[in-house]
Design a protein with these regions (language model features):
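Short, well-ordered beta-strand segments
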Residues: 9-15, 61, 88, 110-112, ...
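Extended ligand-binding regions for polar small-molecule ligands
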Residues: 96, 104, 181, 185-208
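Central regulatory/effector-binding core of bacterial HTH transcription factors
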Residues: 7-68
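Flexible hinge/capping segments at coil-to-helix
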Residues: 75-111, 196
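Secondary-structure junction motif
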Residues: 21-23, 103, 107-130
Length: 208
């Protein structure tokens, strides 16, 4: 019986860069239709989330992408919501001193990013979205990226709506109209019916 109960619990990991606004929507889904016992939520960075999904110790991983060169065939994905890309800057950034600041003006500043957070290595263009390999000071993780931005008067591109930060500011700039997409990654062959139902619920509650 205990083993059955354990197998009926959905294990959902959420990218650690995603803020409380998104988590509140997850709680709403539980409160409206489910019980706390139905889920086991975890806050994970994308490296760990990708590995756990691949190793079948996670049923759904919610984030911007997987840290695999090629997405395994057994892993599916469902877009949940897109948000405009913004420029994350430090609270004391000199960028704040320029009220008419535009995206091209950022060329004077150091840009930071990490491969563990895909929004930070995008070009920011909606019509031609690309991942960049040059012009960015790459660091290991999101926390380090935020510290580098803060202490070096730099910036990083991020999800303007769902990026988690406690210090600093988020700017929406003319010239950056690209979007970050939060997706649900899942194992195709596990609990097919239940996973499909939950994915639909996730999409609906996030867009509500």
């Amino acid at each position: 019986i205990e083993r059955y109960k354990e197998s009926s619990v959905l294990r959902i990991g959420i990218d650690s860069s995603i803020n409380k606004l998104f988590w509140a929507k997850m709680q709403k889904m539980i409160n409206d239709k489910h019980s706390e016992k139905d889920f086991r939520f975890s806050k994970l960075d994308s490296y760990i989330g990708s590995r756990m999904l691949r190793e079948n110790t996670l049923d759904i991983y919610i984030g911007y992408g997987l840290n695999d060169l090629e997405q395994p065939d057994e892993i599916g994905e469902k877009p949940l919501i897109s948000s405009r890309i913004g420029a994350y800057i430090g609270h004391e950034s000199s960028i704040n001193e320029h009220p008419e600041f535009k995206a091209k003006d950022l060329e004077r500043y150091v840009r930071y990013g990490t491969k563990s957070y895909l929004c930070s290595v995008m070009n920011g263009q909606k019509n031609d979205p690309q991942l960049l390999t040059q012009g960015i000071e790459l660091v290991d993780n999101v926390d380090t990226m935020k510290l580098k931005v803060e202490f070096n008067d730099g910036y990083a591109l991020a999800d303007s709506r769902y990026f988690s930060y406690y210090d600093g500011d988020m700017l929406l700039l003319p010239g950056y109209d690209g979007e970050c997409v939060i997706k649900a990654f899942y194992r195709k062959k596990r609990n097919k019916k239940k996973i499909k139902e939950i994915l639909e619920e996730l999409q609906n509650v996030v867009k509500s």
